[in-house]
């Protein structure tokens, strides 16, 4: 697939036809969810945030809107939508959820479910000052280009853990966020 010419209809068709199999074991029992907001344009965008430098965990990192599943959340999808509204003012009613990717185990002990949703291009994003320092859009075709991600093996407590690194403009995209973007690319058939 030529990444420079990805159109929204092509992305949607590939995502629906190549639906992921979600049956994997996890060591983490605490649930979290992130929203992968795809901006509805002929050539779609990917909405990302940069976390506030004042946060205790993952300060300053590029991330998807998301967080822990609360007792009030009916599902991981509801949690992702709630967090997106809290962090960047995306109303849940504005998100067309098209599916989920297989959960990812975080280094902080959560099983994180990525929820893929389509959002309108004209939403007035408003970053929560406590949690988000920037909201930006990256062309989806660029985000899904696997050649932009570089592996780094980290050794922690005797175990090797691979993370992926990339840059977009002034933003350093790495860790779980880069890994989820790569999984989305592989899900729709992008070849390494």
From Swiss-Prot:
Highest taxon listed in the record's lineage: Bacteria
EC number assigned by the record: 3.6.1.-
UniProt GO MF annotations: coenzyme A diphosphatase activity; magnesium ion binding; manganese ion binding
Cofactor(s) this protein cannot do without: Mn(2+); Mg(2+)
Gene3D superfamilies xref list: Nucleoside Triphosphate Pyrophosphohydrolase
Any one GO biological process: nucleoside diphosphate metabolic process
Residues involved in Mg(2+) binding: 83, 87
Keywords: Hydrolase, Magnesium, Manganese, Metal-binding
InterPro entries registered for this protein in UniProt: CoAse, NUDIX_hydrolase-like_dom_sf, NUDIX_hydrolase_dom, NUDIX_hydrolase_NudL_CS, Nudix_NudL
Domain Nudix hydrolase: 29-160
Motif Nudix box: where in chain: 67-89
Family: Belongs to the Nudix hydrolase family. PCD1 subfamily.
HAMAP family in the cross-refs: Nudix_NudL (MF_01592)
Function: Probably mediates the hydrolysis of some nucleoside diphosphate derivatives.
PANTHER family reported for this sequence: MITOCHONDRIAL COENZYME A DIPHOSPHATASE NUDT8 (PTHR12992:SF11), NUDIX HYDROLASE (PTHR12992)
Protein name: Uncharacterized Nudix hydrolase NudL
Organism: Shigella sonnei (strain Ss046)
């Amino acid at each position: 697939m030529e990444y420079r010419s990805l159109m929204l209809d092509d992305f949607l068709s590939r995502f629906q036809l190549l639906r992921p199999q979600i049956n994997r074991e996890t060591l983490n029992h605490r649930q979290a969810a992130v929203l992968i907001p795809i901006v509805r344009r002929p050539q779609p965008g990917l909405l990302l945030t940069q976390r506030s430098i004042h946060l205790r965990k993952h300060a300053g990192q590029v991330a998807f809107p998301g967080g822990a599943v609360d007792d009030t959340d009916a599902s991981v999808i509801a949690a992702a939508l709630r967090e997106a509204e809290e962090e960047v003012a995306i109303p849940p009613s504005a998100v067309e959820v098209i599916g989920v990717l297989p959960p990812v185990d975080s280094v902080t002990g959560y099983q994180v479910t990525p929820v893929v949703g389509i959002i309108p291009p004209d939403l007035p994003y408003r970053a929560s000052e406590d949690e988000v320092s920037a909201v930006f859009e990256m062309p989806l075709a660029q985000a899904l280009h696997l050649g932009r991600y570089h592996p780094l093996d980290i050794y922690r407590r005797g175990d090797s853990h691979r993370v992926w690194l990339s840059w977009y403009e002034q933003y350093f995209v790495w860790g779980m966020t880069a890994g989820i973007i790569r999984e989305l690319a592989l899900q729709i058939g992008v070849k390494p």
